[in-house]
Amino acid sequence: AAVTSRTLALAGESWWEQPEHLARFEARMDRKTVTTGCGQGTIYSDLMATVRSDAESLGSFNEASISKSQIHRVIAQARNHQAVYQEAGGVHACALADNKPGSDGGFLYFVEDVGRHNAVDAITGWMSMEAQGPEDKIFYTTGRLTSEMVIKCAQMGIAILLSRSGITAMGYELAQELGICLIGRCQGKHFLVYSHPERVDFES
């Protein structure tokens, strides 16, 4: 293998050559992204640069907003749809809700699954198969709003995320950077807006 550098260990009075594949490994480590989902997944790519570029190019981010009454309607819809959870528990739910002006917040697609990432990926697949754009859409999940959830929704082009659960610090930081509104602890008439509150109309 081609030699790219030499390292000297003074204590042992020895040196060794660093082959090219180790240099490539170090380059990959420089691009490492550690996410905050289950098990802290690690991605070795320029993922964040791609996500930022995607978010900036999506017009759906620019005007996205939601009213307080619409948040309440989405929460009520979610409670009524979770048949498997109410029967047996042990599953997560994700939904894509209509956020067009004058809509009732009805669910365009709803899925329950033992894995929250399986559920969000099902939403992504449905949008692709049905040629559904991200405009006037709300994403709802029962799972935590982690960095992975924020990244996936940014790639979908959805700027408003609701969750029955809370958020993580990295999820919050990414949402702040990308312009995504995170709304957590959605139960009954209660919710907490964690990021970009300017996207929420609290008067209607």
Language-model features, listed with the residues they occupy:
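Feature captures the catalytic cores and cofactor-binding loops of soluble hydro-lyases/lyases
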Residues: 5-7, 116-193, 199-202
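Intrinsically disordered, low-complexity regions enriched in acidic/Ser/Thr/Pro/Gln residues
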Residues: 1-93, 97-104, 108-110
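Short beta->alpha transition motifs characteristic of CBS
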Residues: 111-115
